Amino acid sequence: MSRQVWKGSTLLNPEPPVLVSCGSPDKPNLITVGWTGTICTQPPMLSISVRPERYSHHLIKESGEFVVNLPTESLVRAIDWCGVKSGRDVDKFAAMHLTAAPAAKVGTVLVEESPVNLECKVTQVIPLGSHDLFLAECVAVDVDEQLLDESGKLCLNKAKLIVYSHGDYLALGRKLGSFGYSVRKKKKVNQKIIGANSISASRLEGSRAVNARLRAAHVRPLQLC
């Protein structure tokens, strides 16, 4: 394989282009964030990177709260639009016909049209350069009940989530496996069935041979039960 060496860049792809809601309930705002990720399990934490000059930056920094709304195929136009327009000039919720619904644990709002909403409280802000990194604890998750199966398990494959890759919005493709499948042992019940089938086949062949010899000796053949 032939390779070229480029200078260091931000080519870690794909990533979820999330809609982040922030601001007060009477004047909420939306910002599209392409750089976000899970950073801790206990406590549950995630991060978002925002340029200091963005209108939403000071809203998040002052309130210490925001909501990450997962991106879906039906939201792709709003996601793109909210990423290029400023909340200083327009009401993004109204312009994109989105519903600002009350959050359960934070003082800002969530996007009702998004199937999963992660309510977050900022724990630390780290200036990095072009962007500030907001570290936050996820204090609540709002889930559309239509994504739950009969046992209450969350089925995100029903949500039609999208990703962002080097300037393009992409739908997710087919399932390739589940966590741990590469080391998972085969179920023993299958092995037992295979073994039982092999024994039955061997017995049948043996019985056929015996019956053939009995016929040759003019003796009535055996009957398998």
Question: Where would I find each of the regions flagged by the language model?
Answer:
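Basic, polyanion-binding surface patches
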Residues: 1-195, 225
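Short, low-complexity intrinsically disordered segments enriched in A/P/G/S/L with frequent Arg
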Residues: 200, 204-208, 212, 217-224
